[in-house]
């Protein structure tokens, strides 16, 4: 996404539609972000300027990419927010980030992605800071988002339960190195790398312990 500080060293290529994103200027990357590449962050509170109401962020983003009027932006966002179960869109847009729950902020980011219609959505640990009920609801919204838009999604997560529910293919990394890549079914049923087997076995052990506890209650 080109959001790292200039002094952070990066190497390699990131190819998107035949173009190396690492070679683009900030001005060129700014055009890609939002329209082509959209990122949904782990902490919704950090995704929005705390000194501005939510609507300011949404209007600035959509006006920059589409040149829409405030009225058109409100209409577009109202429809998108209702589709992710957020009612009273105008009221929400007039609130500050700290006045909304983590789950609501995640849904606002998903609604914004619906309006932007990017080619790729990068979701970085989007359910980590949420309670179990909010996690379930947000994952369902991600699945609907992918189905509705037909876009590609890179979903970064340590939660294998969420990964199993939302992913088609899994890429396992350890210390920044790719150690295994395969379909969801193969990774969970026949993991090849020792580290992947460790992750999957721990997940199964937790699930079995939970089932045993529930059976005793």
Regions found by a protein language model. Name each.
Residues 136-149, 161:
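Helical segment within the ABC ATPase nucleotide-binding domain
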Residues 87-93, 181-217:
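Short catalytic/signature loops enriched in Gly
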Residues 115-119:
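A short, proline-enriched helix->beta-strand linker immediately N-terminal to the Walker B motif
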Residues 20, 72-91, 201:
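Conserved ABC ATPase "signature" region
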Residues 9-20:
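Conserved ABC transporter NBD signature motif
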Residues 163-165:
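A short, surface-exposed alpha-helical micro-motif characterized by mixed small hydrophobic
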């Amino acid at each position: 996404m080109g959001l790292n500080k200039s002094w952070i060293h990066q190497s390699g290529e990131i190819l998107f539609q035949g173009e190396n994103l690492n070679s683009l200027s900030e001005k060129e990357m700014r055009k890609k972000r939002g329209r082509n590449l959209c990122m949904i962050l782990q902490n919704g509170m950090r995704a929005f300027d705390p000194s501005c109401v939510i609507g300011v962020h949404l209007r600035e983003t959509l006006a920059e990419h589409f040149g829409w009027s405030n009225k058109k932006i409100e209409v577009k966002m109202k429809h998108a927010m209702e589709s992710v179960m957020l009612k009273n869109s105008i009221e929400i847009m007039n609130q500050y980030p700290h006045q909304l729950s983590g789950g609501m902020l995640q849904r606002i980011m998903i609604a914004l992605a619906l309006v932007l219609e990017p080619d790729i959505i990068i979701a970085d640990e989007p359910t980590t800071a949420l309670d179990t009920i909010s996690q379930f609801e947000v994952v369902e919204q991600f699945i609907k988002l992918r189905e509705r838009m037909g876009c590609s999604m890179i979903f970064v997560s340590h939660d294998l339960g969420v990964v199993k529910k939302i992913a088609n293919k899994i890429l396992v990394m350890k210390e920044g190195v790719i150690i295994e890549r395969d379909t969801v079914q193969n990774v969970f049923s026949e993991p090849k790398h020792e580290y992947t087997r460790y992750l999957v076995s721990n997940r199964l052990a937790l699930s079995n312990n939970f089932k045993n506890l529930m059976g005793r209650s």
